[in-house]
Amino acid sequence: DLVNWKFERIVLPVQSDGILGPDRVGERVKVMKCPSTGEYVMYMHADDLGYMDPYIGYATCSTINGEYKLQGPLLYEGKPVKRWDMGTFQDTDGKGYLLIHHGPVYRLSDDYCSVEAEAAYIKDSGESPAMFKKNGMYYMLYSNLTSWEKNDNFYFTAPNIEGPWTKQGLFCPEG
């Protein structure tokens, strides 16, 4: 019910090696249920402790709270997506999207396990992307590029996920 929470289990334990092995971090976790497979797909930023080896990793599970199996890095055109700040969005038609800092919006494959195409590139964007859709309009939210420091948050709108995207300004008080 998103109000009463209880700990059930660690759903993706540290791996013995690889992108989530020892001396690596996994963060910014997002989970979507894939309509074509019925599986839950978890995405995360995986990196070394110095934040110099980023990957978007993914894991799958048949239940939302079961033990996920790390599948590896998410691939686009046969290469790992080496980014860090990301979000996800599932459209009303069931298509899944990976939202990346600095502008790329990647459309996921039907099974959500790889990137199919770059659906849009939002120029002059920021970090910590989040998207929602209301009354047929897409809204993309960002914060400025200041890492963990406080900053202003702004948004773009588009009538279609592929654009055109228009910067609208701040969505909360300045400062």
Please annotate each region the language model reported.
Residues 1-175:
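Carbohydrate-active catalytic/glycan-binding domains of CAZyme proteins
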